[in-house]
Amino acid sequence: MKEIYLIGLGNPGKKFLNSRHNIGFLLLEYFSKKYNSNFLFKDKLKSSYSEFQIDNSSYRLFLPNTFMNNSGYAVRAIVDWYKINLDQIFIIVDDKDLPLGKIRFRRKGSSGGHNGLKSIIEQLQTQKFKRIRIGIGSPPPIKGEKNFNTISHVLGNISLEEKSILDKVFRRVIESLEKLNTKKEEYIINELNSFDKDQH
């Protein structure tokens, strides 16, 4: 049976529940709920864990309990416990440098300034792992200042307008992930990277 490991990045706790930075958590919770599977905390994995099957594939979903900046410790624990090849892992992560509603699937790359990805790269000692980046858009500029209010933006709650767009994004990502056992990865990459929120 094919095993697929999906790790969503975010921060644990009610305070961050609906924040833009928790896109990875929110998407995997959406996915797990679709298959009536609940998350349970596993201390040895430093994560909450959910598992279900689609056709001949086993999907294992993880929500690290380490907080965003230490995500790598959870990913390392998951890799070591299951003794898995990094090619089986997909990281789901927010990206403020992508417009809201855009999706980017990459097989490797730098952290792009994202602390969660930075931690994973440090712990795995490689940039060669797959990541699905979901755009949350850039924050509006602060009046009288040159810099964007990045922290407030990523930790801020998702608005109703944003949620309606992200619902479309989540459906597309999940539909694509469901095809991992029947379609070639290149097909999935093209499907996600060409997604247009205005046509769905």
From Swiss-Prot:
Enzyme class: hydrolase
Keywords from the named record: Cytoplasm, Hydrolase, RNA-binding, tRNA-binding
SUPFAM superfamilies referenced in this protein's UniProt entry, alphabetically: Peptidyl-tRNA hydrolase-like
Catalysed reaction equations from the record: an N-acyl-L-alpha-aminoacyl-tRNA + H2O = an N-acyl-L-amino acid + a tRNA + H(+)
Binding-site positions, tRNA: F16, F67, N69, N115
Xref: InterPro entries: Pept_tRNA_hydro, Pept_tRNA_hydro_CS, Pept_tRNA_hydro_sf
Disulfide linkage: none
Molecular-function annotations in GO: peptidyl-tRNA hydrolase activity; tRNA binding
Residues the UniProt record annotates as site (Stabilizes the basic form of H active site to accept a proton): D94
GO CC term (a single one): cytoplasm
GO annotation (BP), single: protein quality control for misfolded or incompletely synthesized proteins
Enzyme Commission number: 3.1.1.29
Superkingdom of the source species: Bacteria
Active site: H21 (proton acceptor)
Site (Discriminates between blocked and unblocked aminoacyl-tRNA): N11
Summary of the function given for this chain in its UniProt record: Hydrolyzes ribosome-free peptidyl-tRNAs (with 1 or more amino acids incorporated), which drop off the ribosome during protein synthesis, or as a result of ribosome stalling. Catalyzes the release of premature peptidyl moieties from peptidyl-tRNA molecules trapped in stalled 50S ribosomal subunits, and thus maintains levels of free tRNAs and 50S ribosomes.
NCBIfam families, alphabetized: pth
HAMAP family membership: Pept_tRNA_hydro_bact
Family as reported in the entry's similarity comment: Belongs to the PTH family.
Protein name per UniProt: Peptidyl-tRNA hydrolase
